[in-house]
């Protein structure tokens, strides 16, 4: 009976490690990128007259959102993602999420900016994102490429709504176009 429990525990641990290394191995390749919707920032859109230069005028992460971002970063590291190149939208809620993932410095990337205020820019924005991905997958080496962005950007890229803090493991072609994806719900 005791031996069965040990064997069961070892099997569970092996399955977990296989799953963990699968994510990190995929992210080391040039075929996969990880898109993340910023962590919880209650509300929809931004207040009237917001400014991208002034975080106080924007919708921002609350304390739960900050905790979510830290936890996601820790979870990714437990999955074997140790070395990552992180890019963020210019919005403060995305920059804060990127910083709290704790992979070192992140870079602001215009191709990740929200087009929520002008949905007519969806296709143009998605093409910019694809071009950005195409350029980065050629030069990232074995670093994971993590992009923190917005609901509308991810919806346009993959066609599915995701919640705050959720991630998408996206398989892409050399042009940065989506081939397939796996939704990774925000770990809790």
Regions from the PLM with identified roles:
Residues 88-91, 148-152:
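Short, well-ordered beta-to-alpha junction loops that form the rim of enzyme active sites
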Residues 31-33, 143-149:
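Generic beta-sheet signal
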Residues 21-110, 115-119, 124, 160-188:
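Active-site-proximal alpha-helix that buttresses catalytic centers in soluble enzyme cores
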Residues 1-3:
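N-terminal secretory signal peptides that target proteins for export/translocation
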Residues 5-15:
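Sec-dependent N-terminal signal peptides
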Residues 16-20:
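Sec/Tat signal peptide C-region and signal peptidase I cleavage site
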């Amino acid at each position: 009976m005791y031996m069965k429990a040990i064997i069961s525990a070892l099997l569970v641990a092996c399955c977990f490690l296989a799953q963990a290394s699968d994510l990190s191995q995929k992210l080391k390749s040039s075929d996969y990128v990880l898109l993340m919707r910023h962590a919880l920032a209650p509300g929809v859109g931004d207040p009237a007259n917001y400014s991208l230069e002034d975080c106080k005028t924007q919708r921002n992460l609350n304390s739960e959102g900050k905790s979510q971002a830290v936890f996601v970063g820790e979870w990714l590291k437990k999955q074997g993602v140790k070395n990552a190149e992180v890019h963020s939208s210019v919005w403060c809620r995305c920059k804060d999420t990127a910083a709290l993932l704790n992979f070192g410095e992140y870079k602001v990337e215009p191709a990740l900016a929200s087009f929520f205020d002008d949905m007519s820019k969806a296709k143009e924005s998605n093409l910019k994102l694809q071009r950005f991905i195409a350029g980065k997958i050629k030069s990232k080496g074995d670093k994971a490429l993590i992009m923190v962005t917005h609901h509308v950007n991810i919806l346009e890229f993959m066609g599915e709504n995701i919640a705050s803090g959720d991630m998408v493991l996206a398989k892409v072609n050399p042009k940065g176009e989506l081939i397939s994806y796996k939704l990774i719900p925000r770990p809790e």
